Amino acid sequence: MPPRRIETGDGRAALEAVAAGEAPRPATATAVRYLLQLLAEKAPGNSVEMRVPPFGAVQVIEGPRHTRGTPPNVVETDAATWIAVATGREHWTDAVAAGRIVASGVRADLSALLPLRP
């Protein structure tokens, strides 16, 4: 069963709550999942796994399909960093350099896909 689609209004409301500060955990979770959903729509595929624990993960970017074990191309970050880079408040390269994004694999650079336009 595919994950429940987050409607645009719900996603934007969650992003506004996070931007206002002190968002409750459910709003942060919705904001993260909404942005992951937008990324998956923008770059469909299965060659890179984008992880934002504990809220979600998606596989994106066309290329070799991964089926078992740890994918060869993985990006992992925390919720605050993901929201910042996905919305353009922080640059991908700055977050990687600071160690807030861990990207491994030849296809794991998502900078060309960001920021998203929620």
Protein language model regions, located:
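Feature captures hydrophobic
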Residues: 1-118
